[in-house]
């Protein structure tokens, strides 16, 4: 009532823009890291064929799946740590 009490402060447009930019940077960085790691692991350094082989495609598929699964698991673990009040280096 009347702006007093438990109302959360409004986030400004500038803060929303900064948060969106930070999220975009994070997603772009994660994508670039994924491409670099899976490409170096799965694609032969000397291209013998103009198309991705079945073996390379399977490796890439597994690499991407593992990468995302790992990120989900890490995110869930960090969320649990945050909810329980644990922080890095402290248990």
Curated annotation (Swiss-Prot):
Chief localisation class:
mitochondrion
One Pfam match = zf-Tim10_DDP
* UniProt GO molecular function: metal ion binding; protein transporter activity; unfolded protein binding
Where is motif Twin CX3C motif found? 38-63
Q: Where in the cell is it found?
A: Mitochondrion inner membrane
Keyword terms, alphabetized: Chaperone, Disulfide bond, Membrane, Metal-binding, Mitochondrion, Mitochondrion inner membrane, Protein transport, Translocation, Transport, Zinc
Q: List the InterPro entries.
A: Tim10-like (IPR004217), Tim10-like_dom_sf (IPR035427)
Q: Name one GO biological process term.
A: protein insertion into mitochondrial inner membrane
SS bond list? 38-63, 42-59
KW Membrane (keyword) present? yes
GO annotations of cellular component type: mitochondrial intermembrane space protein transporter complex; TIM22 mitochondrial import inner membrane insertion complex
**How does this chain sit within the bilayer?**
Peripheral membrane protein
Tell me the subunit arrangement: Heterohexamer; composed of 3 copies of TIM9 and 3 copies of TIM10, named soluble 70 kDa complex. Associates directly with the TIM22 complex, whose core is composed of TIM22 and TIM54. Interacts with the transmembrane regions of multi-pass transmembrane proteins in transit.
State its role: Mitochondrial intermembrane chaperone that participates in the import and insertion of multi-pass transmembrane proteins into the mitochondrial inner membrane. Also required for the transfer of beta-barrel precursors from the TOM complex to the sorting and assembly machinery (SAM complex) of the outer membrane. Acts as a chaperone-like protein that protects the hydrophobic precursors from aggregation and guide them through the mitochondrial intermembrane space.
Return the similarity comment: Belongs to the small Tim family.
In the record's own words, the domains note is: The twin CX3C motif contains 4 conserved Cys residues that form 2 disulfide bonds in the mitochondrial intermembrane space. However, during the transit of TIM10 from cytoplasm into mitochondrion, the Cys residues probably coordinate zinc, thereby preventing folding and allowing its transfer across mitochondrial outer membrane.
* Name of the protein in question: Mitochondrial import inner membrane translocase subunit TIM10
Write down the species. Debaryomyces hansenii (strain ATCC 36239 / CBS 767 / BCRC 21394 / JCM 1990 / NBRC 0083 / IGC 2968)
The gene name reads: TIM10
């Amino acid at each position: 009532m009347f702006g007093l009490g438990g109302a959360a402060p409004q986030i400004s447009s500038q803060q929303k823009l900064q948060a969106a930019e930070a999220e975009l940077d994070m997603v772009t960085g994660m994508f670039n890291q994924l491409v670099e790691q899976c490409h170096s692991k799965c694609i032969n350094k000397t291209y013998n064929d103009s198309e991705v082989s079945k073996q390379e495609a399977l490796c890439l598929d597994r690499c991407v799946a593992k990468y995302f699964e790992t990120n989900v698991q890490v995110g869930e673990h960090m969320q649990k740590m945050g909810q329980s009040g644990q922080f890095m280096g402290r248990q």
